[in-house]
Structures are given as structure tokens and as C-alpha cells.
Amino acid sequence: RQGETSRYLAARNDLYASVMIAQAILESDSGQSTLSQKPSYNFFGIKGDYNGQSVTLPTWEDDGKGNPYYIDAAFRSYGSVENSLQDYVDFLEGSYYVGVHRSNTKNYKDATAALTGVYATDTTYGDKLNSIIEQYQLTIYDTY
């Protein structure tokens, strides 16, 4: 649903739309998670608060060795889909995520590898994103 919006935002921010869409699919359970629903609209599982707004929900984490554990965490609450999408690209602007930018990668797989263990604690995060990108042929959104 958000393919063209993702293409536009990714193009303007040196990102891969395919990765952006795959992250939204994975992090929001294809838009079915409580976090991705109204009023939070957090499609990317970004923790913390947005303009002082957050919601606390249970989530699985990975200890970096493939061992999952369960915690309650505060996640950003956006109030609109547009705010969620824009905050995602703003979130990836920092030097911490320089490895996901198109100008620093050969392809989307380099970007998903750079997210693994950094954006998410899941040690198989990049593999999961790659599978989603391939399954739904999301690279069509990487052309501008």
C-alpha cells in the first residue's frame, strides 16, 4: 500500500525502498501488529518516543548470540502513517546507519546486512528482510 510513498522517500533520502518496505512488513507483521495500528502507526518497531508520545508493549529481543528473551519496551507512537514513514527515514539519517545508504552500498543486500545487529538485535534480521524482498519482488521500488 505504501510502495510509491516509500519509493519517493527512499529516493530523496539515499535509501532502498525495498528495504524500507520489507522492514515495515517484518516489523509490523504485515500491518497486523498492535503497534502498527491506530493510534501508534509504528510500522518499523522504533523504540523511544515521538514528540513525547510512546506506547509500552512486550517484545522479543536477541542477546546477539541467537538467544531470544522477552521484555516490555516503549515504542514511538506517531498518530499518522505519514509521521511514521518520515520518522523512519529521519531515524536512518544518523552516522550510525551510514551503511544502509545507497551511496555506501552495492545493493540492497549490503543494506540489510548493515541493519543486522544494529537496527534490530535479531542475528538473522538481514536474512529475513532479504527473503521478504525476494518473495514480494520489492526491488521494483528501488528504481526511480
Show which residues each predicted segment covers.
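Catalytic cores of secreted/periplasmic lytic hydrolases that degrade extracellular macromolecules
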Residues: 1-144
